[in-house]
Amino acid sequence: MSDFKHIPKYPVQTLGKALDILNYIKDNPSSEGISLTEISSALKIGKSGVHRLLDTLMAYDFVEKINGISPAYRLGWGLFNAGNAVPKQHTLNGANYVPVIEKLCNTFLETTNLGILNNYEAIIICKMEPAARMLRTNTQVGEREPMYATALGKLFMSDLPENEFENYFERTTLTKIP
């Protein structure tokens, strides 16, 4: 992860903690969910605070509670709904790119990804694989990868002004991506 993210001038700490919880659940997927205790311990937020934040996130369907032997939490469908609205607000200059991606995929019989550059990370926004393909890629729509780690990211780097390209590598620690 690079350090190019926006730093708010006047951060709202409670909102930041709620978003940290969402990101923690996202980054630690489990079909059984994640316990309040684990979230509290990992994020160093008191259990009562985590409980109140989770309760609020449940009210917006961003988190759902799994009732089992001990309650656990997972991402809710409200986030899925919110995420699906993103491409509708970013129309790529009004282009309907799906037919183009389909044609490329079917012509060359190769996995075809369309991505955008966001905070110096490549984000896949559309992926198509040919039906007859035996070997599948493990990339997912919505996945973020550092620019240096993917062909798509390197394509974005090739279009950066030289000073921005140099600044990127001065501020980025290169790590092997699994």
Describe each model-derived feature in a short phrase.
Residues 173-178:
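Active-site-proximal mixed secondary-structure blocks
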Residues 2-89:
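N-terminal helix-turn-helix
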